[in-house]
A protein has these predicted regions:
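Short loop/turn segments that flank or connect secondary-structure elements
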Residues: 1-153
Length: 153
């Protein structure tokens, strides 16, 4: 993972990620999460969320806030951010895909065409931060934890 473009910063400014997520929260999505965590079971579903650099850095902030310095693979193939209690350990910092992906029981995936403007903002931020496009969650967050650690030095 590339480091953020401005190495002089103590840490990348993630306020745009926060703004994008706040804009998403203002939209009424005709879906209702059933909290089954099926979508968090990557091996079971065969689907892994992809994160831009901004999303990964924001998620890494949540990982650190939960008291961890790294993420470890889940032996059952679930999201490494899924807690033993079945809840997301970084819920407030969860990625865009986790905020917009809904299983069939909840109404299915929300059409991306209704979220295209927010996705474009995440992609523009990725470019601004020096990212190279979306990457699988475990890799992106793991690398972001390394970047955040380097920025603190």
């Amino acid at each position: 993972m590339p480091s953020p473009k401005s190495k002089s910063e103590a840490a990348p400014d993630l306020s745009e990620v926060t703004a994008i997520y706040q804009d998403l929260e203002k939209r009424v999505l005709p879906r209702s999460c059933q909290i089954s965590t099926r979508c968090c079971r990557f091996r079971l579903t065969g689907q892994v969320p992809f994160l831009t650099l901004g999303e990964a850095l924001y998620a890494a902030k949540g990982v650190r806030a939960s008291g961890r310095k790294e993420i470890k693979p889940n032996p059952e193939g679930a999201c490494p951010l899924l807690g033993a209690n079945g809840f997301c350990t970084i819920y407030q910092h969860r990625p865009f895909g986790c905020r917009t992906h809904f299983c069939e029981a909840a109404g299915g995936v929300y059409p991306r065409k209704h979220l295209a403007d927010l996705i474009q903002r995440l992609e523009a931020l990725d470019e601004k931060l020096g990212g190279e496009g979306s990457r699988p969650l475990p890799v992106a967050v793991g690398d972001a934890l390394q970047v955040r650690r380097a920025c603190r030095r």
